[in-house]
Amino acid sequence: MSKRILCKFFAHGACLKGEHCEFSHDWKDPTNNICTYYQKGICSYGSRCRYEHVKASRPHPSASSSSAVPRPSPASASNTLACAFLPGVAERDLSPVPSSSLKPTWNLDSLHQDSVDEVKTSNPGTVKPEELPICSFAAAGDCPRGNECPHIHGTICPTCGKCCLHPFRPDEREEHKKVCEKKHKQLEALKLSQEIECCVCLERVLSKATPAERKFGLLTECDHAFCIACIRNWRSSSPSTGMDVNSTLRACPICRKLSYFVVPSVIWFSAPEEKKEIMDNYREKLRSIDCKHFSFGDGNCPFGTSCFYKHAYHDGRLEEVVLRHLDAEDGQTVIAKDIRLSDFLENMHI
């Protein structure tokens, strides 16, 4: 057994350094499970923190390194206390060594204080089950401590198959199920999208050369698959003389159904509800971006009320949308665009 302290990240199954970690990854080594944020008074987890909220005793620093006076025979008292509270620690491993070979990260006095506080706070009647953290080793698949683990072993999630559901936190358990099911559906949709080919270039969309090309261009009125580059090139072509834009460029190249806009997406939908969700999320994202044509009220957006971007003024006020309905001679009703005085003044030659 080494003389290093047990890595607190390894104890919770979250050490990323592995064999290169400067702390011990041996369960026989002593632990120092004190919350450092609690010592500073800024722990935001409170009673739900997985680390101990106790006041650690700190060694008194000496005036200078040359005048430091060692404590009278600390080895025997420290060994006795450590062996009493840590049965797995042998006295031969706690023999005094030169101070130059030790790192001042912890001492036996603080370890004894931690053990005393742990004994005082280990009364099961003082800690509620919902306040205990879930064992990350059991959630990952196997806990080496088994029934002696101080943390709670969760129940199995029916979607991901991990023991990560806290049995005493119903809200957290339901939230995990919803998030897990959503991620599972996204992975299934991404798996199905790998085989979808573009109807124009006949290539697999997600197998394109560059990441910018690995997107689908969804049309609102039909379910034909196109890559974003092909459908945008189709709709941006210059129409011939006398050609109707709506019936040629804005229509689907396959079924000729009219779609007014294209929605980029990294996955392909398998149901109408999924397509609607993708389009709603796309519109919601654009609403948070300021329109460059509107320019906080200083410009004029050619799309008017049909613009998906945010029309906000310098003071944060949103543009009030007022639709003007005009009745035509044939009985149809059309929506007129906003007419500004500046449009007339620009055409006047004064």
Curated annotation (Swiss-Prot):
It is an enzyme of class 2 (transferase). InterPro entries: MKRN-like (IPR045072), Znf-CCCH_4 (IPR041367), Znf_CCCH (IPR000571), Znf_CCCH_sf (IPR036855), Znf_RING (IPR001841), Znf_RING/FYVE/PHD (IPR013083), Znf_RING_CS (IPR017907). GO terms for molecular function: DNA binding; ubiquitin protein ligase activity; zinc ion binding. It is found in: Nucleus. Keywords: DNA-binding, Metal-binding, Nucleus, Repeat, Transferase, Zinc, Zinc-finger. Pfam families: zf-CCCH_2, zf-CCCH_4, zf-RING_2. Its main location: nucleus. The keyword Amino-acid biosynthesis does not apply. This is Putative RING-type E3 ubiquitin transferase C3H69. It comes from Arabidopsis thaliana (Mouse-ear cress).
